[in-house]
Amino acid sequence: MFNFKRKRKIDVTGSTVKTLDWTNVSLSQYIELQDLVLENEDELEQEDIMLQEIQILYKVDPLSLDLQTFKKYVESLKFMKKEIPKMKIKDKYNLGGNIYYLHKKLEQFKVGQYIDYQRIMQTKKGIETYPEFLALFITTEEDGTYGDGYDVAQVITDIRKYMSIADATSIAAFFLKSCKLYTALSILSSMWRTRKVIKDRKTRKQLRKKTMHLINLVLNGE
């Protein structure tokens, strides 16, 4: 007995099977796929999960498909066994018809961005953070400033709904690494400024040890 729930607003017939890969699966679809497995791993049979995957990715009602068409959809899911590819990071992205610009220079980071970055990293984990995290570096104008003259919530929505998981993971990996390095360099710079005013050799040594431990935590989480 299938434990399958139909969703609203889907193509009932699904006669045309589109070719999908990770470059045209949206971030929201990937999050939904991930939640499907994590939340129902012990409750759903593999067949139920497969039906849900077809519905999420193709927005069709799999139970209404003829057997020949259903077989094509099942075959089309093979790409999910492959790794998500690393994509070249672009300067601008078209998300649902809206053009957004990516800002890669962390030295232009504003206090508001850093506060939001810390909040996101402390309150959320994993792929669910990506829409908010990526919105820190994306604006509606080429020379725009974070949150200035546009709705950040709309950017987050467009990233979640329209950015491919391949683009999202590639951009996130770049900025997560960059943010860690930038934070580590800031800590190191602060240590050297502090060391200059500390005369006691033992205290300076302890400061250096604590600083290097903190940098290791930032870079490696250890």
Predicted features and spans:
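Charged interaction scaffolds used for protein-protein
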Residues: 1-222
